Amino acid sequence: MEETSSLARSRRMGEMPEGKLLLSMAVPMMLSMLVQALYNIVDSVYVARVSEDCLSALSLAFPAQNILIGLGTGTGVGVSTMLSRSLGSRDNKLANRVAGNSLFLCVCCWIIMAVFGIFFADAFIRSQTDIESIRSYGDSYLRIVTIGSVFVYFEINFERLLQSTGQTKLSMWAQMIGAVANIILDPFFIYGWCGLPAMGTTGAAIATVIGQAFGALAGFLFHHKHNKEVNIRLSDCRPDGHIILDIYRIGFPSILMVGIGSLTNYLMNRILMAFTSTAVAVYGAYFKLQSFFFMPVFGLNNGIVPIVGYNYGARKKERIYRTIRYGVLYAVCILAVGLLLFEAIPGVLLQAFSPSENMLAIGIPALRRIAVHFPIAAFCIVGGSICQALGKSLYSFFTSVIRQIVALIPAAYLLSLTGSVGNVWWCFPIAEVVSACATAFFLRRALRDMDRKLTLSEE
């Protein structure tokens, strides 16, 4: 029965029409990402009702928190790609060893972030602001989420193991369980419901960690019961240098890209803080709102990568090209909806964060100017995931460097010299146009290299 189920899933990955296959795999992950985006917004909405300083504090903590998540997702990219290739080439023994080593790497990632939280969280927040209330809120939040990050790493890992074998619905449920638990617990810990002490940002961090623990437990149970293609034994968890190297050869550029993104957010916070802390709050609110549209695209990517990886291992070139076309089309449609809403009702969107008049004055034009780049970003995001699935993760890394270090931050700094915070927001469309050119160049090279390798293998 298990072999029959495995064979059916393998045939689906290699034979089902690409558009239908992509939707069947991506929609559950897109829905789970929407739940995650809802959590991100609700978390900030709760905190914003305490004070604008609390919202600013979470914005200042975001770069470090983003690295925390990026370390897990980058590792997951490598694990997912290697698993998909191993299963596509029918090497189940290697797939088991990859999955086992991924558990070892979860513990390593947690140790790194826990050390950062214990010794460097306060210094990180202080480097961005000298406002004592914001510093205190940010330090307490960041310290707790980093020390408790062990759960998010196992949650991400089990979700990736499920996704790599086509169990995307179970992956969605694991993430939804964690996110919903977080949403439910937030007001209890933030406002002090049912006799609990009101803890503000500290309470938000505690609710986050508990929600991640629920997600990790659900992911483990789903994997243990349903993921029959991957059978992890204790011996598979023994560190294997070659496997770990291969995982990070694929995933490390993704981690570096997140690191660059976090550096970009950090520098943007400093640029905006020179105007007012309200601009930082607007920047944080924007990130929460845009996640409603970008997170589904990232969920779409999680469907694209295993399909491309499997068919690359199975040497089915035409299926790869059709998957790319469908992926770009779906991503552009999603972000076009985001563009329309950001342009039409920015004030309504910002009302979720209990904005002051000053926050609305800064935020409404900010959302309209930033959103111009959304459809262009769709192509860049999908193009980067295709490069990763084809083993060309460095191309995605170079594109990210060009977008954020070469274009975004210099543009933001130069625009800030005009003395108007409103002009700074134009740096996003400028950077995305540059990024699209770089993505087109590198994606073409990756596909040309794939064509050459597959042609040689056929000979």
What are these regions (language model features)?
Residues E52-P63, G138, L142, A205, ...:
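Small-residue hotspots at the loop-to-helix junctions and early N-terminal turns
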Residues M1-A26, L83-V150, L196-F252, V308-H373, ...:
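Short alpha-helical transmembrane segments in multi-pass integral membrane proteins
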Residues G76, V145-Q163, S171-A179, A204-L217, ...:
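Short runs within selected transmembrane alpha-helices of multi-pass transporters and secretion channels
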Residues L34, L38-S56, I125-E132, F188-M199, ...:
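Helix-terminus/linker motif at the lipid-water interface of multi-pass membrane proteins
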Residues S24-D43, I144, G178, G211-G215, ...:
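Transmembrane helical elements of multi-pass membrane transporters/channels
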Residues G19-L38, V42, A64-L71, I147, ...:
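Residue-level signal for short hydrophobic patches within transmembrane helices
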